[in-house]
């Protein structure tokens, strides 16, 4: 097996180790996913962050299983994340959704399973539409179910006990929701995944969560960049972080790319990152973000960029008040 970069890990409260740098599967096309995952494993990636809602878990699984079959990696060396979508929050539907994920990935277990959003949409049978996305069984109209988050969480805890999930966690949760969930949970969330970039830094949330012993993964590390292809008006009207003078100056000083600076800004504070790339050179670059340190001045200057600008807000879907 070829020499691959050694990626630092975060020790989770569940006892498992999660790589600090991974490969994000959001918006990876069905046509390219298997090859991209396979090539990422060859490059040295071991954490793959997927979700039911991404609609590409079959192809992601093909890439993973090809690499395992060829001896590039063992299953236990990989850290595979998936996420429970909003239509499957009712406890009686949680295992059905997980089984679909495991079947698509062609794996016996996932290392981490997150509640994707603290929102319960109306259940949609898998045979009717999968992944359902925003479909709630009635055209473009949103419909919801009265399912408390703790009920969904208890169903996930049972699946940990059954050996189908190693660690469970949450995504897009606020501090108050986390505070409440911890008080009813038997198994504490191992990971919180949040939108995290210099325009949206959330320092108080990060301080609270890390002190509570919960690891953090940041998504959309490049800020508006992730949302340009979705034609988000907010993203289109925001200067890219790659071109921001502060980021460019820091990158030049360290002889690194702006992307590497943005990723190191997170990993240096023990926040995992999950960028993706089709480009082999950038794939390797994104993995090489632990071999330099930003100075206190660098960190202070990046801190000044925080404007509380969120690009992934369910209020834009149907006035869903998670972040209001």
Swiss-Prot record:
Residues engaged in binding substrate: 116
GO function terms (MF aspect): D-xylose reductase (NADPH) activity
Binding locations of NAD(+): 171-172, 220-229, 276-286
SUPFAM superfamilies given in the database record: NAD(P)-linked oxidoreductase
Active site residues per record: 54
Family to which the UniProt record says this protein belongs: Belongs to the aldo/keto reductase family.
Designated name of the protein: NAD(P)H-dependent D-xylose reductase I,II
């Amino acid at each position: 097996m070829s020499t691959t970069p050694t990626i630092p890990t975060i020790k989770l409260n569940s006892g498992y180790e999660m790589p600090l740098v991974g490969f994000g599967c959001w918006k990876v096309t069905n046509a390219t996913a298997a090859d991209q995952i396979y090539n990422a494993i060859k490059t040295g990636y071991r954490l793959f962050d997927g979700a039911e809602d991404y609609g590409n878990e079959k192809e992601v699984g093909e890439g993973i299983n090809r690499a395992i079959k060829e001896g590039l990696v063992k299953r236990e060396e990989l850290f595979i994340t998936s996420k429970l979508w909003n239509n499957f929050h009712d406890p009686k539907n949680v295992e059905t959704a997980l089984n679909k994920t495991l079947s698509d990935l062609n794996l016996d277990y996932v290392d981490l399973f997150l509640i994707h959003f603290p929102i319960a949409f109306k259940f949609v049978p898998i045979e009717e539409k999968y992944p359902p996305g925003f479909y709630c069984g009635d055209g473009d109209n949103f419909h919801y179910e009265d399912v408390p988050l703790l009920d969904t969480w208890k169903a996930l805890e049972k699946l940990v006990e059954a050996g189908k999930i190693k660690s469970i966690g949450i995504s897009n949760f606020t501090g108050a929701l986390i505070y409440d969930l911890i008080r009813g949970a038997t198994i504490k969330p191992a990971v919180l995944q949040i939108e995290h970039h210099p325009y949206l830094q959330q320092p108080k949330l990060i301080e609270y969560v890390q002190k509570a012993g919960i690891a953090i993964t940041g998504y959309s590390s490049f800020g508006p960049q992730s949302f340009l292809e979705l034609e988000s008006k907010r993203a289109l009207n925001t200067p890219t972080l790659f071109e921001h003078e502060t980021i460019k100056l820091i990158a030049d000083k360290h002889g690194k790319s702006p992307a590497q600076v943005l990723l190191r800004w997170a990993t240096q504070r023990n926040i995992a990152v999950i960028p993706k790339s089709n480009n082999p050179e950038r794939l390797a670059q994104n993995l090489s973000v632990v071999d330099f340190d930003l100075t206190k001045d660098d960190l202070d200057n990046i801190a000044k960029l925080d404007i509380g600008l969120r690009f992934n807000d369910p209020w834009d879907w149907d006035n869903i008040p998670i972040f209001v």
